[in-house]
Amino acid sequence: MDLITTTAELASVCARLANYPVVTVDTEFLRETTYYPLLCVVQMASPDEAVVVDALAEGIDLKPFFDLMSNERVLKVFHAARQDIEIVWHQAGIIPHPIFDTQVAAMVLGYGDSIAYDALVERVNGHRPDKTHRFTDWSRRPLTKDQLEYAVADVTHLRDVFAALDADLKKRGRGDWVSEEMEVLTSPKTYDFHPERAWERLKTRVRKPKDLAVMMEVAAWREQEAQSRNIPRSRVLKDDAVGDIAIHAPATPERLATLRSLPKGFEKSQWGADIVAAVQRGLARDPRELPKIEKPRNNTNGAATVELLKVLLRMTSERHAVASKVIATVDDLERIAADDAADVGALRGWRRELFGEAALALKHGQLALAIEKGRVVRVERS
C-alpha cells in the first residue's frame, strides 16, 4: 500500500490503473461544518495494487484522479456512491462514469435495504472489517498507520464484494436492473442543487399556494446563503423554521419576531431582513405560476389501498429476493393508490414488470390477496 502525496505520483498510479477494466474507489471527507464536503483522502485499488491519496497534501493536483474517474474504459466500483460522486462533481464538474454501486447491487440481489459496507463484506467473505476509524477526523495530519490501513481495506475488500455481486447479477439476469439505477446516480440532475428547487427537499408540506410561494422563496434564499458561506443549511435556518415562516408569512420584522422557531433578536439581523424580503417576494408571486399542490392522499379508501400495496410489496420482495426499498417507496405506493399514471419509479422499467403491474391489478380488483395455510398468496381474478 502506497501513500500518494504528489501530483507526479498520482499521475503515475492513475496511468497504471487506467489499464484495468475495473478499479475500486472510496473517499474520506468532512462536511459537518460546511455546505460542500471537504475531500481529505482518496483510496483506489486494482487487482494488483492499492493506494491511498492524501487529497490535502500541499501542492497536489487531483486532475489525474478526475481524469481516471471520467475514463469510459474503466468501470469505477463504489459502495453507496452518491456522496463520493457529489464530491467529484463539486470539485471537478464531472460525474464518474461508468460506475457500479455495490450497495444498489446488493439491494437488487436481496441483501436488504441499504446494507452497510462492513455488513456486506461479512456476508460475502465472512470477514467483518474494522470500522474503528469510521468517524475519525480525516483532515488531521499526519495520517496514522492505523488510518491508512483502515482506508486501504475499504477498497481491497470492495474488490471481492464486486466480484461476488457481479457474478450473481449475471447468473440471475439482473445486470440491467443495476444499470438502470446507475443512470440515475450518474445524472447531473442528481447533484445540481439549484436554489430555486431547494424547497423540494423539505419534508414540510403546505396546502395553500401562498404558503408554497413563501416556502419556495425562503428555501431558495437559505440555499444561496449556505452555498455562498459554505456552511450547512441548518446553520442558516432550520427546516422547521422554514416551514413556520411559510405558514405564517411574516412580511415585517415585527411579525418575524413573533415566531418561536427563530432565536430572540433574529428579526434585527441582516438574515432577518433577508427573510422578510423573501416573504414579500413570495406573497407577490402569481399563484398560477406555482407548482401544483398535491391533494392529501390520506383518505380512508386510499389508506386501505396503500396498506394492501404494502403487503403486495413485501410479498414481491420476498418472492424475488429484492430489497423492498429498491422496488418502491411508501410515497410511490401512496401515489399509485391515487393515480394509475403516477410518475414513480415503481411504474417504470423492471419495477413495473416486477411489481407495478400487479399493484395496479390489485388496486382495480383484478388481483386479490388471500391466506392459505398461514401464508398470504396472490389470487388472480377474472
UniProtKB/Swiss-Prot annotation:
GO MF entries: 3'-5' exonuclease activity; nucleic acid binding; nucleotide binding; ribonuclease D activity
Keyword Transferase: no
Limits of the HRDC domain: 208-289
Catalytic reaction list: Exonucleolytic cleavage that removes extra residues from the 3'-terminus of tRNA to produce 5'-mononucleotides
Top EC class of this enzyme: hydrolase
Family: Belongs to the RNase D family.
The protein's name in its UniProt record: Ribonuclease D
Source organism per UniProt: Nitrobacter hamburgensis (strain DSM 10229 / NCIMB 13809 / X14)
Organismal lineage: Bacteria, Pseudomonadati, Pseudomonadota, Alphaproteobacteria, Hyphomicrobiales
